[in-house]
């Protein structure tokens, strides 16, 4: 194929060299639209045809339009001799988004990324190429600014994020349109682009024209903000300015350091941890900020924030960020645990490493799950009142410890914390839980 405009090729070459990327196989997220069409053809040329076009059908538009787009994509790849793979979403995104309380846009993106990751592995490719351009970057920064993003967010869309690359971030929408026009290349126009159904469309169609009238050359200013924000984020990402104790399913912070540190850096660290666990998008700055309005310095232990994936608690002189484990394979248990011996549970393998009771000869304990709680109480009402103290804990993770049929301790298997003990009997205990069917 002969390119009448070499500008995009030059920028792609610069992008590859700047990020030290090899020229191995790439999965190109192809929608048939202008941006992904320009990306696909330019990468095909640049990588000597070592590309696979991947199309994901969300079916969030009408079936008629979706099928027309699929036919266009097939015809286009046939015309330019490009390998094509099509994946149709097997989930009703509209109804599922309503059930989960998330936007259609967010859920569609999630399933699309999952499909792309699968295609990457199945085809032995090195990268997934997305067609975000310079204008998308500007729109993203503006959206994040008005959503109260941290400086990390104002750095914009990353050009390289693990195996995801965006070679067109330095290419404007006008350059893309000129490239397609000069080469007489057709593309599919999504009918929703001109509608204000989604936030990005409203920013593009309504907000940006108003900003352009008032602030001439705002694009350069936003680009500068993005560059400075990225430098800031990279600098604070190099070293751990905040001491953190990391366990398998938790992060623990010293309370005094936590309170003395600038709130921005504390929040940034929490979001960084959540992002590494793949759940940052589910937590808003507002929710986190509200959590810290609690009188956190008071003596009483309390839960600051609780979600379906984790909870943030103040316990003694620590702030703990604790992730929930997979309950899918949970089964009730009732067994004897001896010091130095492993026992297999549905939640994992457990080891009693150390035990100190009022009687030195004690080396084993009766251990049972929450379902057996009533056998330690003659009165069920008293049992209910007693266990109401542990309402913040998930019952599936409570392990009851007994000696001579007397309840002497309760351990939260999610955190391995001793949440209650009969101190006159149980002095110290150390338990380890590994492997099993836990979510790694």
Swiss-Prot record:
What this protein catalyses is: cytidine(34) in tRNA(Ile2) + L-lysine + ATP = lysidine(34) in tRNA(Ile2) + AMP + diphosphate + H(+)
Where in or outside the cell it occurs: the entry states: Cytoplasm
Short name of any one Pfam family annotated for the protein: ATP_bind_3
GO cellular component terms, alphabetically, are:
cytoplasm
Q: Which parts form a coiled-coil structure per UniProt? A: none
Enumerate the InterPro entries for this protein. Rossmann-like_a/b/a_fold (IPR014729), TilS/TtcA_N (IPR011063), tRNA_Ile_lys_synt (IPR012094), tRNA_Ile_lys_synt_N (IPR012795)
Q: Which domain of life is it from?
A: Bacteria
Q: What is its main location?
A: cytoplasm
| A molecular function GO annotation | tRNA(Ile)-lysidine synthase activity
A biological process from GO: tRNA modification
Sites where the protein binds ATP: 31-36
Its Enzyme Commission number? 6.3.4.19
What family is it from?
Belongs to the tRNA(Ile)-lysidine synthase family.
The protein's role, per its UniProt record: Ligates lysine onto the cytidine present at position 34 of the AUA codon-specific tRNA(Ile) that contains the anticodon CAU, in an ATP-dependent manner. Cytidine is converted to lysidine, thus changing the amino acid specificity of the tRNA from methionine to isoleucine.
What does the record say about domains?
A: The N-terminal region contains the highly conserved SGGXDS motif, predicted to be a P-loop motif involved in ATP binding.
User: HAMAP family from the xrefs?
Assistant: tRNA_Ile_lys_synt (MF_01161)
| Record's protein name | tRNA(Ile)-lysidine synthase
Q: Which species is this UniProt entry from?
A: Borreliella burgdorferi (strain ATCC 35210 / DSM 4680 / CIP 102532 / B31) (Borrelia burgdorferi)
Q: Coding gene?
A: tilS
